[in-house]
A protein has these predicted regions:
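Short, structured coil/loop segments at alpha-helix boundaries
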Residues: 4, 70-72, 82, 171-176
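Sec-dependent N-terminal signal peptides
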Residues: 4-14
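Sterically constrained small-residue positions within well-ordered secondary structures
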Residues: 11, 70, 82-84, 136-138, ...
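Sec/Tat signal peptide C-region and signal peptidase I cleavage site
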Residues: 15-20
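Non-cytosolic coordination micro-motifs
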Residues: 21-60, 95-203
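Mid-chain, structured segments of secreted extracytoplasmic proteins
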Residues: 62-111
Length: 203
């Protein structure tokens, strides 16, 4: 009888420990390992439709794929400079969140992009807002965007989850050619093209 009780206690502790580890890392309150439907329900309960908002002063997050414990997001940083009156320079950041932490090589690229922007147009100001958190700035020391999130996303996971960082609308081509173009006109044209593509998109 004692062996049965001991086995039961060990089983309970093992299950509780495993569940606790699984629940420790959450995205919008949903633990990793949850099904696609569970993620989808959680996002929709928070009023998120899955569309990307590009052009109304700020941008949103586009959840481009949710595969079990692997989620890929896309969001947009907007930079406004002191030497420009209304021009906004948009940077697209794609990052992956998994249950296995990884390094964030994309952050160095982000810093380089922002530094190049500041060399050309003056001090940059981040004006982007995002679903589930907000962006604040630390441009004085590192010219890097510091992400300050509320409790909906684990901060450490978010930092370690960066997978890639690119300039919006064209990747390397945009990075190499953006300074030879009228930035505002370029962004408006590309934003309209993407917005047209996304106009009917949802989960």
């Amino acid at each position: 009888m004692r062996k049965v009780i001991l086995f039961g206690l060990l089983l309970y502790v093992g299950v509780a420990t495993a569940f606790g580890q699984k629940s420790a890392v959450q995205v919008f309150g949903v633990p990793f390992g949850s099904t696609y439907e569970e993620f989808l329900t959680a996002f929709k309960e928070k009023g998120f439709t899955g569309k990307t908002y590009i052009y109304e002063g700020g941008s949103g997050i586009d959840v481009s794929s949710i595969y079990g414990t692997f989620m890929t997001y896309e969001c947009y940083i907007e930079l406004r400079a002191t030497k420009l009156t209304h021009t906004v320079y948009k940077i697209k950041i794609s990052f992956s969140v998994t249950d296995k932490y990884k390094d964030i090589p994309g952050m160095e690229q982000c810093r380089a992009i922002i530094s190049r922007f500041e060399e050309k147009y003056g001090k940059a100001t981040l004006i982007q807002k995002m679903h589930g958190g907000k962006v604040v700035q630390d441009l004085e020391e590192s010219s890097a965007a510091i992400w300050h999130l509320d409790d909906k996303i684990d901060l450490e996971l978010f930092y370690r989850g960066f997978d890639d960082c690119k300039v919006t609308y064209g990747g390397k081509e945009a990075l190499d050619g953006i300074f030879q173009k009228e930035v505002d006109q370029y962004n408006q044209q590309k934003a309209q093209e993407i917005q047209n593509q996304l106009s009917g998109s949802d989960f």
